[in-house]
Amino acid sequence: MPESQIIELGTLGQIPLYSLERALQDPLRAVKLRRQIVSQHQATGNIDFTTDGSALPYEGYDYKAVLGACCENVIGYMPIPVGVAGPIKINGKMVFLPMSTTEGALVASTNRGCMAINAGGGVTALVLGDGMTRAPIVRFPSLEEAGAAKQWLGSDAGFLIIEDAFNASSRFARLQNIKATAVGSDLYIRFTASTGDAMGMNMISKGVEQALEAMQKHGFESMDVVSLSGNFCADKKPAAVNWIEGRGKTVTAQATIPEHAVRETLKTSVEALVELNVSKNLVGSAVAGALGGFNAHAANVVTAIYLATGQDPAQNVQSSNTLTVMKNVNGDLQISVFMPSIEVGTVGGGTVLGPQKAMLHMMGVQGADPEQPGRNAQELALLVAAGVLAGELSLCSALSAGSLVKSHLTHNRKKG
């Protein structure tokens, strides 16, 4: 079929936009034709828009990697600037942190934080917990049956049955614990499992499906699955359960900044930083009724690194849960962050794309760790926490010194 006919039929809605890759067996050609269909469609006809004449690029991209994995109805790709902060010394290693952002001053500020941290010997960071969660809703005919199911899940015998079914779903998924809450005759079951180097949402969802089938075969035939996700997980929304129980990687990172580095690099004082952190990040956040937001701007750094490394940017909602603490220790500044729900992976999702894969490689965490599955994803979580630590340190310093507006005018406003 001639391209002109494909475009005409697509414009009239007789060929679905989503079917072009399958029909043409050529992802790049499908993108090219879809751009023309969108340009000629009545939805864009009255706004003088053409994708061919637009600044949105489409050539020179690996759409085969995108197909069936990352995006649908593709008309191009969105270039976002990528900068590097650092290198920063973390657990004895020097690493650059890639950050993809359009916010001027963010990379420069984080880089300044890295410099100050290195002056004190670097960051020490630990993974305190590692478990992705999924929480389906199941429904029973009566409250009594829901209660019996909750009790069974909490028993050794019940857990072993569920564990066997769950673990059989994957080489890497390993069930850690189950927490069930009954609301009337509905049961919300929060499964927690390790998922290797994958972020793990798809993996754990598959395991949960098999676990629920096992439940139905072991005395709970009347159980109906209302939804595989019941928001007790909780994914992509603020939730106390993630702050308290953790989700993904639970990480803490700490550094000591010598007084001279605080004064010379950060242009402030230890006393001013400690006071500002209490007033802003602790008291101010409490006044605001913050949930997991006891920090200055953790989400800025988390999202920038996520975009650069192929993570799910929407998961910055829970991944940015951060408690920032600053103390005066013998005249120097001790700063730490506690992040209970960093959700990252080094395989799957956007990590299959070439540019994102390259940034993971630069950080030394690309792909699956063949010797210790999960180690690369844990290392990435530590690097995210180190970046957040640097970002918190620099922004709070700018606020305490009164230089925030000046720095943004310098880095975020084009002259002339």
Swiss-Prot record:
Q: Which Gene3D superfamilies match?
A: 3-hydroxy-3-methylglutaryl-coenzyme A Reductase, Chain A, domain 2, HMGR, N-terminal domain, Hydroxymethylglutaryl-CoA reductase, class I/II, NAD/NADP-binding domain
Q: Which residues are glycosylated?
A: 167, 277
Q: What GO MF terms are annotated? A: hydroxymethylglutaryl-CoA reductase (NADPH) activity
Which enzyme type, at the first EC level? oxidoreductase
Catalytic-site annotation from UniProt = 103 (charge relay system), 236 (charge relay system), 312 (charge relay system), 408 (proton donor)
Q: What induces it?
A: Expression is positively regulated by the cluster-specific transcription factor pbcR.
**What are the transmembrane regions?**
380-400
What GO cellular-component annotations does this UniProt entry give? Answer: endoplasmic reticulum membrane; peroxisomal membrane
Q: To which pathway does this protein belong? A: Metabolic intermediate biosynthesis; (R)-mevalonate biosynthesis; (R)-mevalonate from acetyl-CoA: step 3/3
State the annotated membrane topology for this chain: Single-pass membrane protein
Task: List the keywords (alphabetical).
Answer: Glycoprotein, Lipid biosynthesis, Lipid metabolism, Membrane, NADP, Oxidoreductase, Steroid biosynthesis, Steroid metabolism, Sterol biosynthesis, Sterol metabolism, Transmembrane, Transmembrane helix
- Record keywords: Transmembrane helix included? yes
Alphabetized InterPro entries for the sequence: HMG_CoA_Rdtase, HMG_CoA_Rdtase_cat_sf, HMG_CoA_Rdtase_CS, HMG_CoA_Rdtase_eu_arc, HMG_CoA_Rdtase_N, HMG_CoA_Rdtase_NAD(P)-bd_sf, HMG_CoA_Rdtase_sub-bd_dom_sf
Return one Gene Ontology term, BP aspect.
secondary metabolic process
What is catalysed by this protein?
(R)-mevalonate + 2 NADP(+) + CoA = (3S)-3-hydroxy-3-methylglutaryl-CoA + 2 NADPH + 2 H(+)
Task: Report the sequence similarity comment from the record.
Answer: Belongs to the HMG-CoA reductase family.
Give the function comment from the record.
3-hydroxy-3-methylglutaryl coenzyme A reductase; part of the gene cluster that mediates the biosynthesis of the diterpene ent-pimara-8(14),15-diene (PD). Within the cluster, the HMG-CoA reductase AN1593 functions in the mevalonate pathway, which produces isoprenoid precursors. The geranylgeranyl pyrophosphate (GGPP) synthase AN1592 is needed in the formation of GGPP, the precursor for diterpenes. Lastly, the pimaradiene synthase pbcA performs the 2 cyclization steps that convert GGPP to ent-pimara-8(14),15-diene.
Identification of the protein by name: 3-hydroxy-3-methylglutaryl coenzyme A reductase AN1593
Q: To which species is this protein native? A: Emericella nidulans (strain FGSC A4 / ATCC 38163 / CBS 112.46 / NRRL 194 / M139) (Aspergillus nidulans)
